[in-house]
């Protein structure tokens, strides 16, 4: 079994966080799930899919499995890891990467036991805040943004057919993108394949930064500039989360909407 990477010094910068989720105005069920775990300094959004409530099951399983893996590691750092660690990654990055793989294993095992859920899956985006760096892992089109000063920067690149189209044809207009028939089809998710390879990003931790972790029900309805304005002008994170949800619903609320905000320092 693989060994555990060595842990670093204790974290010093405090965090504040909140998370809200809403079914939106055009869906009866909410298949999004989120977790805001201050003790583990872990923040997750998952957007389920699969029908027959399977999407809701998959998204909740993903959040629970990843948080449980973090909690288990911190309780016993010497235990064997269930997947191979990457010696080039930090502890935080390995925890996220392996935790996402564990979540994928659990979703696939559950799907095999219930034929009604054999097509269930979920996107995932997870943010882990360490002592000196922030690590993001994701699969699918749920996103992580970072507000630093006046700049709201998207830190994740969607795993979706439309994102691949935009990369191949950067001249595509907003109208062409909106009319693209497969714009909601993701190319990477939990549950769809035996192995999942989450995209990883690591950046230095800076006090004053605010991170937004969200499902496509938010970013697909609310322009980045409007999201930035809400976060910058609303210091109270609970109020800012509610305003983000409200903005998506005011734009028609075509999908489930989830937003988690995390302030550093």
Annotate each PLM feature:
Residues 1-265:
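PP2C/PPM-type serine/threonine phosphatase catalytic domain
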């Amino acid at each position: 079994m693989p060994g555990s990477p060595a842990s670093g010094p204790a974290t010093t910068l405090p965090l504040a966080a909140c998370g809200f989720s809403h079914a939106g105005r055009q869906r009866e069920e909410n298949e999004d799930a989120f977790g805001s775990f201050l003790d583990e300094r872990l923040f997750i959004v998952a957007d389920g899919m699969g029908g027959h409530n399977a999407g809701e099951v998959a998204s909740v399983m993903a959040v629970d499995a990843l948080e449980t893996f973090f909690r288990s590691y911190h309780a016993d750092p010497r235990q064997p890891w269930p997947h191979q660690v990457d010696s080039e990654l930090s502890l935080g990055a390995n925890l996220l990467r392996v935790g996402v793989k564990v979540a994928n294993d659990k979703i696939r095992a559950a799907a095999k036991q219930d034929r009604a859920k054999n097509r269930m899956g979920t996107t995932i985006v997870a943010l882990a805040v360490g002592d000196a760096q922030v690590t993001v892992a994701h699969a699918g089109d749920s996103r992580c943004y970072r507000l630093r000063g006046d700049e709201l920067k998207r830190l994740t690149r969607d795993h979706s057919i439309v994102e691949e189209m935009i990369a191949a044809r950067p001249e595509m207009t907003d109208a062409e993108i909106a009319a693209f028939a497969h714009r909601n089809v993701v190319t990477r998710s939990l549950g769809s394949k035996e192995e999942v390879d989450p995209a990883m990003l690591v950046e230095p931790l800076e006090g004053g930064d605010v991170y937004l972790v969200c499902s496509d029900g938010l970013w697909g309805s609310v322009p980045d500039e409007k999201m930035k304005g809400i976060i910058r002008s609303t210091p109270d994170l609970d109020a800012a989360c509610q305003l983000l949800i409200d903005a998506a619903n005011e734009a028609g609320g075509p999908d489930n909407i989830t937003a988690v905000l995390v302030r550093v320092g």
